[in-house]
Curated annotation (Swiss-Prot):
Keywords: DNA-binding, Transcription, Transcription regulation. One of its GO terms (biological process) is regulation of DNA-templated transcription. GO terms for molecular function: DNA-binding transcription factor activity; transcription cis-regulatory region binding. This is Uncharacterized HTH-type transcriptional regulator VC_2383. CDD domains: PBP2_LTTR_substrate. Belongs to the LysR transcriptional regulatory family. Residues 18-37 bind DNA. InterPro entries: LysR_subst-bd, Tscrpt_reg_HTH_LysR, WH-like_DNA-bd_sf, WH_DNA-bd_sf. It comes from Vibrio cholerae serotype O1 (strain ATCC 39315 / El Tor Inaba N16961). Pfam families: HTH_1, LysR_substrate. It comes from the Bacteria. Residues 1-58 form the HTH lysR-type domain.
Length: 286
């Protein structure tokens, strides 16, 4: 009961509403409220207060999350490690959506013929790392920088170049660009590099696909990774590479709990990713 309440509070701190928290935990909104109420009663502290359509955490709740959040995820992970991965145990690979769209279609279709007992889910990199730490995901396939002190086994598959997409020809580096969400910890490094070149992030999207489509529609040029060019089949006349941005790349990693690397099924999945992604990353843009 106590662990359920803590897990619910941790999810609520990210999702901000009872309904979204319930969706993440596959429980009803009333069950979320009941779990939080029981936790408040157990601890003798008020943990949440209404804030319009959202829920705001109290200072006591923030302190509780800061002190036990990492430990709770690690406990989940240790319990997860006790599970034996049989040939038919369902494996979950949590991935960056752009990496799935850009690189994994054909590779994963072939791999599923050999091992049908696994699924793909998509998340942002910080959440992927959390899910692997807690055992909710067996494997993470991440774009962008990983958070510090994650404690996971990682494999660096490559560094994906960025391209500027524009409807009209570009003869010089734009002063404004549509970017992805730079508040995402996996992407914050991009902000410093753009600032160095005097480029202002005019709009920040939650999707590289949305950024590219706006650019192709004539809104503003957009900064997108090479996989988006391939996925959307963007014509070469709309793709522009600038020497000033040559060092701007996004690292691609696999992450997992070290103990899971002993599984031959996990090793086979890692090999499939390792064989496919570097070729795509290093391939010339369209």
């Amino acid at each position: 009961m106590l662990l359920e309440g803590i897990e619910t509070l941790l999810v609520l701190s990210k999702e901000k509403t009872m309904s979204r928290t319930g969706s993440q935990l596959y429980i009803s909104q009333s069950a979320v409220s009941k779990r939080i109420a029981n936790l408040e009663k157990k601890l003798g502290k008020k943990l949440i207060v209404p804030a319009g359509r959202h829920i705001k955490l109290t200072a006591d709740a923030e302190q509780l999350i800061a002190s036990i959040g990492p430990t709770f995820n690690e406990l989940h992970g240790l319990i997860f490690e006790q599970q034996t991965l049989e040939d038919n145990t369902l494996l979950r690979m949590d991935c960056s959506e752009t990496l799935v769209a850009g690189y994994l279609g054909q590779t994963m279709g072939q791999h599923r013929k050999q091992d049908p007992h696994w699924v793909i889910t998509t998340n942002h990199t910080p959440r992927i790392v959390e899910n692997v730490q807690s055992g909710k995901a067996t494997l993470g396939f991440c774009a962008g920088y990983l958070p510090a002190n994650h404690g996971l086994l990682t494999f660096h598959l490559g560094d994906e170049p960025f391209t500027v997409i524009s409807q009209a020809p570009l003869h010089a580096l734009p002063s404004e660009l549509i970017t992805n969400d730079l508040a995402n910890p996996a992407n914050t490094y991009q902000a410093a590099m753009l600032h160095k070149q005097g480029i202002r992030p005019a709009m920040e999207m939650d999707s590289y696909t949305a950024a590219a489509q706006l650019a192709l529609g004539g809104m503003l040029p957009a900064l997108v990774p090479r996989s988006i060019v391939s996925t959307l089949k963007i014509e070469p006349q709309h793709c522009f590479d600038f020497a000033e941005l040559a060092d701007l790349t996004r690292p691609i990693h696999i992450c997992l709990r070290a103990s899971r690397y002993r599984s031959s099924r996990v090793q086979a999945l890692i090999t499939a990713l390792h064989d496919a992604v570097p070729k795509a990353v290093l391939a010339p843009s369209a």
